[in-house]
Amino acid sequence: MNQGTTSTNFDFLKEHDPLFVELAASAERAFASDPNTTLIKLRQFAEAIAQHLAARSGVEFDEQTSQADLLYRLNRELRFEPVVRELFHTLRIEGNKATHQFRTQHREAMDGLKIARALAIWFHRAFGKAGSSFKPGAFVPPKDPSAHQRQLQ
């Protein structure tokens, strides 16, 4: 994997699918210049995780299946804990807002990155080789260019 597709916050997902790391790393790289794109990429990240889970568990879907429908089917089959269901739905909803409203604050994108990381950690603990003993380390936030501006206010 080249330097452009690494992410200290998500590298542990390489074990599952390089696409997961690529999408998460793209979201992180976009953060400073385009927080809106960060949320769109994070929605795609959650979609990739959901599709992976569906394929793994035999839940049928195709390109016409909405993320909401896929999550409903997955929840019926896998019985997600409420917090996991909420992680998926928050990334879906915030990604939709970013796609259709065109404005995202850095604070919202940072929240999205933290939510995506929580989903990634759940996924890795549930399906990774390390299992529940996986220790992810601290979240490393990307630099927030609006933080300085907020301090001045």
Tell where the protein language model's regions lie, with residue ranges.
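Amphipathic alpha-helical interface elements
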Residues: M1-Q153
